[in-house]
Amino acid sequence: MKTEELYTMIQQKPVILDGATGSNLQKVGMKPGVCPEEWILENEDKLIDLQKSFVEAGTNILYAPTFSGNRVKLEEYGLADRAEEINKRLVGLSKRAAGDKALVAGDMTMTGVALEPVGPMKLEALIDIYKEQAKYLLEAGVDLFVVETMMSLAETRAAVIAIKEVCNLPVIASLTFQEDGRTLYGTDPVTAVVVLQSIGADI
C-alpha cells in the first residue's frame, strides 16, 4: 500500500482500526503472563474468529498480533530464535481473517528495555531490533505498519526510522499520554507530532 492510497482512504470515509485483541483473547482463554504470540499460534482459531468478527463489524485495518514480536520481548519467553517464524505465521493468520475485506498492519511496540541514558539500550541496537521485525513483517505481506502504545518518543522514533529503512509502506505511530497530557518521559503531543512527521511517520 502506498501512503497516497492510505490518505485517499481516510479522505473518503472514516477508517476503523482494529479492536481490543489482547483483552478479547483473555476472555476466550489466554492467561495473564503467557507469551501472547505463542498462545495465539497454539490457538489459531481463537484469533481468526475474533478478527473475522472485527471485519464483520466494519474494521478497515486489522493489526497482526505481532505487538511484542520483537526479539527482546520474545527472549523473555525463550523464543527469540523463532522471531521470524512467529511474526510471519501471525501475519498469515490475520491475512486469513481479513480476506479481501480489510488491510493488515504489522503491529510493533516497545521492547521493554529503556534507551540510554535512562537504560542500557543503545539507539543503534534498538533500530536494528526494530528493523529485524519490520523485515519479517514486510516479507509476510503486511499492507502498512502500526507503532503503538509507546511511552517514549525516542523509542517511537527508532521504530519509525527502522521501518522506513526497510520499506516505503505507510507508518501509523501513536504514543500513550498520561492525565497531564504528556508521555511517561514528559513529551507533549505537539513535539511528538513534529518529530515523528519529520522522520517519515505518515499518521
Residue ranges and their predicted role:
Residues 1-203:
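Domain-level signal for soluble alpha/beta catalytic cores
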